[in-house]
Amino acid sequence: MTLPVEPNAKRWGWAENCGGGDFLMWKDAQGRYQEMKGTRTDYRAHGPCLTDVSYSEESSGGEIAARIDVSVPAANDHLRTFLRLRYDVRKPVRWQRLAFFQLGADFYNDVPARRVAIGNVTGLREEWEPRRVKDEYDRPALPLTGEGTWISVHGVEREALKKGHAMASRGLIVRSWRAVLGGKSAAPHVSTFGTEWGKGNHKTTVELSPPPGLTELQPGDFVEAELELVIFPADAAAYYGPDNALRDLLTREADTWRPVHCEAQGNALKPIAKRGEITRSYPLVITVDDEQRAQVIVKGGLGHVPVTFSGLKSPKGHLVLVDGQPVTHWQTDWNAATKRWQIVCNVAAGEDSEMEIVLESTP
């Protein structure tokens, strides 16, 4: 819900994409870009509460197999996109450049943001202005440490924005990370890479990278990660949605690293299951118990939290309650892998308060 940069912009109109990005980006040791092939798409849920799409593919020589799950929840504050990555190395891999994920791709990165910051749920670790260079790294392989590590790309150069583009700051939050690279356990690392699209048109691409000193991936290596991509209006006046908490945050801190940190911290949920089993904390997924019921306590959160009740034998005969009040808007999907149904809804977060979410059976 962000107005584009143009005179007489209207609500609910079209705004250009605010970023671009890419999954596995690999240039081999000779600098040749290695395309992925055999992409297979599985549309498991179309929304409206939470989409769920999976992409499976492999590199052109079969060196790396990739699976990417992408979900976008309903929201009235700002865009969140949930990404689950799994890369499996099948053959030795060497590279001139390798990125497990890019925020802003080499040839799709429209917002002229001039500052980058990194941190975790406790706050800021470092902020800097990347060098304006062409096809070289500004800073390679910085370790991301702590819980809920994040990267913010902000400081938009307003004079460089094109008419009709949305002015946005962007962020990437690493919700979980597990990797073996070069036969050893590896933490996440971030690199900043400079590009130039025509004279003086510099952009910065943020990449999740291998650790420094690593030159080859071996068969059996893998990366498994849960990421959250977020986009915020870089101008508080451009936001026309109903979320007062976001509006207040933007009024104070728009186009800084603080909105990304706020999201990383505010949605680092630690729910407690009274019935059923929590299989994912955010977005929240609960498997029902043997009686097809679930009960979970959630404290805090920002925006609307996507909640999925999985393991249902039937799509009918269920009632979702939040603090005793029925939820009237949800979606029901068939899970072909488990051969069970699931119900998905979006629950308004309690910020600093505690809420009880219950799935009951109806007569």
Identify the residue ranges that each predicted region occupies.
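Surface-exposed beta-strand/loop patches in extracellular or lumenal glycoproteins
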Residues: 96-106, 295-316
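Solvent-exposed beta-hairpin/edge-strand motifs
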Residues: 105-121, 309-326
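Beta-strand-rich recognition/accessory modules
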Residues: 140-279, 286-287, 334-362
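Polysaccharide-binding surfaces and accessory modules of carbohydrate-active proteins
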Residues: 90-180
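Acidic-aromatic substrate-binding/catalytic surfaces of carbohydrate-active enzymes
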Residues: 1-62, 67-69
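Solvent-exposed beta-strand/loop surfaces of large extracellular or lumenal domains
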Residues: 321-341
